[in-house]
């Protein structure tokens, strides 16, 4: 993988054929929080896009007002094409009606991958018809289109939960695109089986939240995620060559300072084997399927 900086608006970048992914290549762009564009020559995917101010409107005047620290890098109506959206769970910064409904209206064939446990909520939040939703559950391997599958892994959003039918409301996704495997954990903390489940999936890159957790946030309805140390440990234990650290920089009460992440990047570059990247806008991460897995993620 190599990272490429750019200074054009993301919408213009995505619409410019000169920057289209090459055959066998996957290109990632960060949307803020846990959101990413996953671009390939065959299809364009989004995962956990939060591109509105839904939460600022909902929580205005409360202890945690959810005011943005950064603007959305693109508006829903500015995408020139889109084929699939994946939502890891029902929380609004991952399944946002202010983002999903405009996308569903603009792209009438757009489909949505959602946890089966939250299907009813997903129907309300997307505003899409039932046939446009693809409900998934941990342990499945679901074909999405030619050369692309998603394999959900249960996530623990502080707790490893199931509903009355035994279905997991919090999921991570292993997304395979023509030989490139991405693991996006959704919101997650460590639990005993996680490292082995992820290791067996053999991802090339992990997209992991690093905003951590504490009693103040969880006690006020804001369950947390991996610490940076825990995210690094998961990537190492699962033998993942590279990590993009995200879920920071959007809400002031629920973030990690960029200099803390950058210091860990520098330390790992000097003393370790893991390639760590801090999610940031104005950056494209290129992953090529033709390169051997261990070499693929080098700087």
Language-model region placement:
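Zn-dependent metallo-beta-lactamase
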Residues: 1-67, 237, 272
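Metallo-beta-lactamase
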Residues: 2-23, 114-180, 264-298
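Pre-active-site segment of Zn-dependent metallo-hydrolases
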Residues: 14-19, 43-90, 98-102, 160, ...
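Active-site HxH/HxHxD metal-binding segment of metal-dependent hydrolases
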Residues: 54-60, 73-142
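Cap/insert and terminal regions of metallo-dependent hydrolase folds
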Residues: 111-113, 117, 189-281
């Amino acid at each position: 993988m190599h990272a490429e900086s750019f200074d054009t608006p993301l919408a213009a970048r995505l619409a410019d054929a000169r920057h289209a992914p090459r055959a066998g290549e996957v290109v990632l762009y960060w949307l803020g929080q846990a959101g990413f564009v996953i671009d390939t020559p065959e299809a364009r995917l989004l995962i956990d896009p939060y591109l509105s101010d839904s939460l600022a409107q909902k929580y205005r005047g409360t202890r945690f007002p959810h005011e943005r620290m950064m603007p959305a890098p693109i508006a829903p109506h500015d995408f020139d094409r889109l084929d699939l959206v994946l939502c890891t769970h029902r929380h609004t910064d991952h399944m946002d009606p202010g983002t999903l409904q405009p996308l569903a209206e603009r792209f009438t064939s757009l489909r949505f991958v959602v946890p089966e446990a939250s299907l009813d909520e997903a129907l309300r939040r997307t505003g899409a018809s039932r046939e446009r939703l693809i409900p998934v559950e941990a342990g499945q391997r679901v074909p999405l289109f030619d050369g692309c599958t998603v394999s959900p892994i249960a996530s623990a959003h502080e707790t490893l939960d199931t509903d009355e039918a035994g279905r997991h409301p919090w999921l991570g996704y292993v997304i395979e695109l023509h030989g490139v495997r991405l693991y996006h954990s959704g919101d997650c903390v460590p639990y005993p089986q996680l490292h082995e489940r992820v290791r067996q999936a053999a991802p090339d890159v992990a997209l992991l939240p690093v905003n951590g957790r504490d009693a103040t946030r969880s006690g006020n309805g804001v369950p947390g995620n991996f610490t940076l140390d825990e995210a690094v440990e998961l990537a190492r234990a699962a033998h993942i060559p590279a990590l993009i650290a995200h879920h920071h920089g959007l809400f002031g009460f629920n973030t990690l300072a960029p200099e803390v992440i950058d210091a860990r990047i520098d330390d790992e570059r000097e003393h370790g084997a893991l390639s760590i990247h801090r999610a940031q806008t104005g950056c494209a991460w290129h992953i090529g399927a033709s390169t051997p897995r261990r070499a693929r993620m080098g700087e």
